Amino acid sequence: MDVSKAVDQRISTRAFLPDPLPEAEVREWLTQAQRAPSGGNVQPWRTIAVTGQAKDDVIAMAAPILAADPRGQKTDRPIYPKDLWEPYEARRRRVGEMMYEALDIPREDRAARLAWFSNNFRFFGAPLALFLVIDERMGHGQWGHAGMYLQTLALLAEERGWGTCFQECWGCLLYTSDA
């Protein structure tokens, strides 16, 4: 598969087969992604992969937090800037509307929307979850390099026929937990 095709067909996958990915292939994928651009070769990211029981433990850790607030806890690191401005807010709302329309969940059915949203905290059934960690002291450039690493992971996953879904929502739990 060429890069253009991988870019064109990559989507956020929200339904996964339960089959585990071969560990050797996962290691190869993660190693290859380390070739992502990084100024000064700083590679400011750390990737934590969880599968099997470890993944189940992470999901279980999230359960009591989500029982208190299905959207996660409030943090000083919101997913979106406060009072997101146009045209960004319209884009964000439209993609949400399209997703819930495709799922046949009406706008007024808040309970069904929150139930669907809670699938984020079960990784949509994916057999592998990755957490990207970066030291907060890193500058804007290094955060950008981490983004290039994530894009590289996504495109290499697409090449392998693996779906991906980037989930910032976990930050609402992990920044405020002992995880």
List each model region and its residues:
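Extracellular/periplasmic catalytic domains that process cell-envelope and extracellular macromolecules
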Residues: 122-125
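Small-aliphatic-rich amphipathic alpha-helix that forms the alpha element of a beta-alpha
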Residues: 29-35, 128-174
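N-terminal amphipathic, basic helical "cap/leader" segment at the start of enzyme domains
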Residues: 1-120
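Conserved small/polar residues in nucleotide/adenosyl-binding loops
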Residues: 175-179
